[in-house]
């Protein structure tokens, strides 16, 4: 826990002030005091609430009104002694619950992943003695010894550092290691700039040091994230909410119909109670689309597989559907919208300015003087040759071609960009021998090397332009040395910085005779400026296309980055992001209240110098405006924003395990274009889900109406509960998968996102279900009325009706392929799924009609061939009627 302390945050305090505020010393606290503080502050562990046991989570999947209907029907069947019917109905309910249980979200794993990041033991100094203790026993005031490879056990203020570098990517998302210091810092600094603090869960990459515990357990930065994650409520997707409402509406309709028919049959038909109950159970079972939850889950699963082939791993099934409704995508810049390969685009010398081709680490691309279409030729001994040798040799990175043919760099991206630039030009061979080196240091902001280069001894320097300008009195030109023209250089740097380029300068000086060592003092005079390189992380070409596709599809793309506003706006313009001419910073967002933030979140598309906490607030602000939000992230701090978003998108390559666990979707290539592909697939899946729902519902209505008509007419029960379940679970489910493989419609990415408030069962859908369901029911009833007086057995009549309904289903599946056009198109032949399920359906129907054990189980009997022909003709007639209905209702559908 954290001690209560007024005043400045720990990173602004000196070591002495920090020790005093937590009542400790360099020798640490005593064991007795540690025990007292442990009692006061609690264990150094992330708080967690107990999860539900698996059996309870399984039982929860029976909490559905339509499942209640099935369970009630099974109970009544048991009371009546119809054990086979009861077993079949119960099996259907259990299968639905199992599918829901298996597909259940694993969101709680993200919390466990955070807890797993804590180390198990730490070396603490107590009363001057080094003790290895469980990390759970650490308390504020403990002095912790840290070494390379250690995982930081709590939030610490550094009190001693020896080349201490820490990998904080899991917390900040920044891939570069952070050099730690003991000095106090000033200003309101973001997490990644607090270089005298160590954060729980991060890893020491090199060096050693000591730190004093200032926060434990839930009060650490990791604890705050854990608390945010635990407090985020799971949100249901639009389709799941709509299906809940549909289920309740069907439940109410079933109750009303059963009550009305019960009263009618008792008063006007004088039916035996047992026969009446059997009919009402059949009505209830017929009205429940038992297979629909399983069908939806399986169709979503097929969408998951399709997206996986496009490098998008879907972790939570409903995400597939939500992608199709997404209205805003908030994306990181580096690596997602850009190549994540820093590339030199311009070189400034005293004589000229050059532009450089190339957008990656591949050393390919010509160099041109500005306004000159002819590539430059690098003359031996020229200024440009010396400049290229300097950036090549004063450089700790290496350029490597992997076996796959891809080019990679080792070392930092800035040095790597300079190394690639030097490799784009073939320089005359020249022997070189490194004599001494000053590594890059964040305090001095340059690196320097002492080389024997051919016959001369030289000192080479690369670093921040403002620093090298202070070191240089002269500039090199092809005509010789000139006094440094500072206004020229500053003007050019400002010009290119406005275009989003990061600037790095290079300089040299002749070495002293016999010099073998290099010190900072050697650079205080005689340094000559050679040139300045402007570099950037270029946009991914496919991201530019993907953003254009998103904008055409009515999806706004917002770029969220830690870069400076000017850089962010420049990249935004290249990418074609909507309002890229304006940017807002994280500092400006922090001072806004929720109302102001919700306005800014919609007004701006470029968010610069932001923190992961800003992301979380931006998601909430956009959601408050009824936006369906996608959010990308890679660091642990991004996890709350990803969990809060409607679609959280984690980076598969640079993302942490915690982020992936919190996300709904993981990109295996960290590429924005993959998100756009997933949106396209999500829309296709939703279209096919809607077609499937429109396909399934008329069958249930037809079954229910057929039973109602039979009861009103006093006829024999046309379908038994097990036959109804056969149709709902076997034939309907089988045929539904044919629609799951339908290709996306041509305008799928040229229409706006669907409004999640519009129910999947809208006005037209209700009409189509009522129209087709009534037509099938009336056709089957007429056939039943024709068969009954001719002396056929109830089993034969039910078998004919079953085959009639199934054949009508098959033809209606073909109707559902195309929403408002003719269904028998070339796409029908391309959809192999339809022909596979048609073959499976034929086998199933042959089994239930002709296999003796199936006849005994379902009460069917064999049919002569002519009845297959009759049912085929009836089904084909209904197919033609629905095709004629499409153009007549097209205007209604459009409205």
Give residue spans per PLM region.
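Conserved cytosolic headpiece of P-type ATPases
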Residues: 1-750, 758-761, 774, 785, ...
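Membrane-water interface at loop-to-transmembrane-helix junctions
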Residues: 756-774, 794-800
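Generic alpha-helical transmembrane segments
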Residues: 731, 776-777, 799-813
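A C-terminal functional module that forms or caps the active site or interfaces directly
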Residues: 816
């Amino acid at each position: 826990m954290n001690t209560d302390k007024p005043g400045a945050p720990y990173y602004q305090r000196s070591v002495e002030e920090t020790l005093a505020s937590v009542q400790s010393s360099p020798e640490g606290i005593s064991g007795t005091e540690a025990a007292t503080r442990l009692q006061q502050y609690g264990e150094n562990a992330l708080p967690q609430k107990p999860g539900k046991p698996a059996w309870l989570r399984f039982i929860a999947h029976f909490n559905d009104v339509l499942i209640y209907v099935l369970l009630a029907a099974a109970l009544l069947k048991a009371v009546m002694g119809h054990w086979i019917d009861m077993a079949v109905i119960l099996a259907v309910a259990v299968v639905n619950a199992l599918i829901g249980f298996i597909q259940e979200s694993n969101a709680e794993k993200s919390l466990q992943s955070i807890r797993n990041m804590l180390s198990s033991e730490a070396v603490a100094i107590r009363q001057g003695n080094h003790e290895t203790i469980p990390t759970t026993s650490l308390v504020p005031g403990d002095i912790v010894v840290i070494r390379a490879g250690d995982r930081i056990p709590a939030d610490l203020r550094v009190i001693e550092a020896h080349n201490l570098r820490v990998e904080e990517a899991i917390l900040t998302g920044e891939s570069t290691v952070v050099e730690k210091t003991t000095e106090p810092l000033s200003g309101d600094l973001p997490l990644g700039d607090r270089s005298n603090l160590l954060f729980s869960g991060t890893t020491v990459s090199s060096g050693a040091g000591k730190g004093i515990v200032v926060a434990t357990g839930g009060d650490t930065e990791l604890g705050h994230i854990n608390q945010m994650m635990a407090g985020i409520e799971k949100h249901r997707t639009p389709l799941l909410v709509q299906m809940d409402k549909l289920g309740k509406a069907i439940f109410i309709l079933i109750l009303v119909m059963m009550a009305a028919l019960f009263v009618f049959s008792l008063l006007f038909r004088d039916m035996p109670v047992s026969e009446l109950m059997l009919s009402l159970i059949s009505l209830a079972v017929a009205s429940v689309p038992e297979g629909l939850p399983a069908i939806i889950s399986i169709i979503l699963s097929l969408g998951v597989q399709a997206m996986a082939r496009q490098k998008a791993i879907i972790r939570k099934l409903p995400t597939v559907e939500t992608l199709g409704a997404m209205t805003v995508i908030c994306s990181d810049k580096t690596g997602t919208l850009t190549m994540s390969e820093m590339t030199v685009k311009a070189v400034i010398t005293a004589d000229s300015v050059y532009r450089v081709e190339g957008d990656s680490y591949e050393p390919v691309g010509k160099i041109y003087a500005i306004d000159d279409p002819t590539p430059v030729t690098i003359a031996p001994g020229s200024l440009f040759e010396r400049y290229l040798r300097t950036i090549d040799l004063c450089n700790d990175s290496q350029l490597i071609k992997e076996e796959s043919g891809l080019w990679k760099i080792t070392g930092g991206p800035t040095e790597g960009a300079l190394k690639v630039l030097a490799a784009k030009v073939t320089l005359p061979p020249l022997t070189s021998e490194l004599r001494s080196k000053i590594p890059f240091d964040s305090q001095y902001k340059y690196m320097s090397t002492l080389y024997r280069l051919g016959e001369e001894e030289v000192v080479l320097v690369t670093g921040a332009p403002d620093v090298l300008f202070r070191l240089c009195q002269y500039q090199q030109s092809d005509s010789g040395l000139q006094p440094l023209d500072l206004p020229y250089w500053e003007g050019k740097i400002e010009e290119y910085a406005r275009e989003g380029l990061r600037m790095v300068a290079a300089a040299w000086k002749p070495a002293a005779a016999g010099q073998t060592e290099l010190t900072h003092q050697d650079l205080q005079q005689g340094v000559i400026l050679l040139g300045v390189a402007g570099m950037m992380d270029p946009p991914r070409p496919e991201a530019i296309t993907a953003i254009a596709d998103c904008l055409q599809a009515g999806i706004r793309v917002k770029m969220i980055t830690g870069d400076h506003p000017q850089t962010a706006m420049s990249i935004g313009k290249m990418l074609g992001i909507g309002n890229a001419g304006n940017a807002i910073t994280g500092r400006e967002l922090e001072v806004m209240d929720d109302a102001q933030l919700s306005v800014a979140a919609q007004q701006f598309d470029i968010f610069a110098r932001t923190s992961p906490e800003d992301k979380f607030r931006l998601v909430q602000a956009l959601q408050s405006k009824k936006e369906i939000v996608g959010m990308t992230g890679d660091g642990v701090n991004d996890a709350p924003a990803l969990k809060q978003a409607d679609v959280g998108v984690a980076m598969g390559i640079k993302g942490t395990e915690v982020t992936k666990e919190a996300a709904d979707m993981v990109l295996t290539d960290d590429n924005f274009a993959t998100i756009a592909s997933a949106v396209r697939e999500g829309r296709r899946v939703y279209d096919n889900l809607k077609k499937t729902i429109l396909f399934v519902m008329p069958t249930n209505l037809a079954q229910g109406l057929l039973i109602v008509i039979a009861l009103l007419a006093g006829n024999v029960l046309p379908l038994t509960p097990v036959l109804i379940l056969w149709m709902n679970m076997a034939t309907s489910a089988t045929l539904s998968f044919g629609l799951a493989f339908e290709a996306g419609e041509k305008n799928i990415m040229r229409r706006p996102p669907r409004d999640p408030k519009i129910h999947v069962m809208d006005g037209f859908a209700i009409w189509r279900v009522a129209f087709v369901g009534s037509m099938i029911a009336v056709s089957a009833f007429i056939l039943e009325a024709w068969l009954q007086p001719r002396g056929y057995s109830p089993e034969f009549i039910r078998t004919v009706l079953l085959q009639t309904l199934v054949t009508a289903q098959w033809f209606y599946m073909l109707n559902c392929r195309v929403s408002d056009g003719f269904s028998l198109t070339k796409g029908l032949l391309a959809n192999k799924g339809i022909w596979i399920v048609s073959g499976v359906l034929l086998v199933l129907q042959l089994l239930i009609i002709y296999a003796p054990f199936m006849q005994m189980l379902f009460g069917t009997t064999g049919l002569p061939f002519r009845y297959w022909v009759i049912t085929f003709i009836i089904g084909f007639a209904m197919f033609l009627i629905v095709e004629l209905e499409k153009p007549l209702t097209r205007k209604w559908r459009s409205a």
